[in-house]
Amino acid sequence: MEEDWVLHGSRPEDQKVGLISWAGTYLTAENYGNKITAVAKGLGRRQTWELIVCNEQDEDCQAVVRLQSIHGHILLPEGDGSVYCGWPRNTQHGYFLLRFHRHGKWTLQCMITGHYLESDGEDVFCNSRVLSAYHMWAPRPALHVHVMLYSPITRCYVRASPEQGCVWVDAPVPYLEECGFLLHFNEGLYHLESSSHHFLSQNDRLVSRPSQQTAFHLQLRPGGQIALGDGEGCLLYPQGSRALLGLGSSPMGGEEWFVLQHCTAWITIKSKNRKFVTIISELEVCARSERMTPMSFFQYESNANTNAIQLRSVTGQYLAQRSHRAVVGDGQKLEPDAIFCVSWNCGKIVLRAANGRYLGVTSNGFLIATALHPGPCEEFRIRLVNRPFLALRGRYGYVGTSSEHDQLQCNMDQPDCIQLLPCRQSIYHFQAQGGTFWSLTAYGTFRPWGKFALNFCLELRGSNLLAVLAPNGYYIRADSSGVLLADSEAITSECLWEF
C-alpha cells in the first residue's frame, strides 16, 4: 500500500510562489505592458510565479531557475539593470542563480550579469553585484492553504491527534481529515492549524489559539519541499519510535523536509439502496454496507477541463469496469477501464463507463455498467469524508469577511473557514466562524451572520475544484468587484472554487 502512495516528481502548482521584498511587497507582473513592480500587499494571480528549474538544488544550497508569470512570460533582466516580462532572446537569457539563506530568504542573481534582483519597495531592478538586505526575497507558497505534509523519509503523512494534543508523522494514506492542515501566513511567519482548529506550538503540543509560540519560519525549496523551524536553529521533524512531530536540532538524512501538497478530496459513494460502495475483497466491489469503513473511501481524481474521473481507494488502486464483468477494485492510473464520465444533477451523479453504459447496482449489490440510459438505479450520492470545513479560493482570491464590507468577499488574501454541516448527500449547511450561518440577500450576496441554516449543494468539478449551487438556484461566483454573488445560471470559470 505504501509503495503506491510515494510521490513521483513535482507538479506545476508545487513550483508556484509569491516573492516578498524587504519592504513587505510582492513581485508583480502587471497587466499593462511588460512592467514589473513590487507594490502589491497581497498574493494574487499577478503575484504568483512558477519556478522553472534548470537544475536541482545542491549541497551548496543553490539552484538555477527561471521565473514565469501567470501570463506565461519570463522575468528578464537587462544589462542596464531594468527588469521586464517577455520572451528570452537566447537559451541563457532569464536564468537566475537561486540561493537559500537564513530564515528561509532567497536571493536571485542573474546568470549573465551577476547582478541581484532587488526592489526599492515599488520598482524592481537588477544592477548590483554587492549583496545586501535589499536583495533578499521571502518566498511564500502559492498553493491553496489547505494542505497535507508528506515525509519522503518516513513515507508517511503528518496527522494531528486532538485527543492526544500532538501531531504524528504516521499516516501512510492521507484519507483522514486529521491529515489536512491550514497553513496560515502572518507577518512573515507561518501557523499550522489542524482540522480541529488547533495550532501546533513550539513545545510540540496542539493549542487552541495562535500566538508567538505557534509561529514558525518556513524554508522553501523548488518542488514544494518545506521545512519549519523556530528561527534559532531548531526544526520540526519526526522523533522517537512513534514519529512525534517536534522541534529538534539534530535531524538526520533530510528528515526535516516535507513535501507540501494540496489536501486531496476523499469521498464516500451511496447508491439508491442507501448502502455505501465498498471494496470487500481485493477485486470485489459492492454497495451492501450500511457503515463507512476505510474501504468505502475514494480519492476523487478529475481534470477540470473534462468530465472524466478516477476513483482511487486506500489500496492505491482504482475502480474499474472491464468488459461485461462487475466493477473491480484493482484498476490502474489512466487505465481506460478505470476512467468514468461523471454527470451532476442536484447533488446526484451518474457514471458512464468506458463501454458507453451507465453504472448501476444489481439486486445483490454488485456494481456493473449495463444501462443504456441512466435512471434512479444509476444515481449515486457522494459526501466529502475528509473535509469538515471549506476554504474557498476563486479567480480573485479567497472567500472571507472584511471589516470594510457587510457582504462576504471573494478577493481576500486569507480565507475564512466554512464549517460543513452535512444534512443529505452533497447537501450542506454553511456555518460561519462564531456559529452563525451564511444568509442570502435578495441581491444574491451573502452575509455570515444568519440565524437559520440554508441548503447548499456541492458539485465536484475537478480533483480540488467544486461549484456551489446556492439556495436561490444559482451558482455562486466570484465577481471582479470582490463581492461574492449567487447569480450564475451556468458554471463558468468564476464559479469554480479551489477547496
Predicted regions and their residues:
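Lectin-like carbohydrate-binding module/patch detector with strong preference for beta-trefoil
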Residues: 1-499
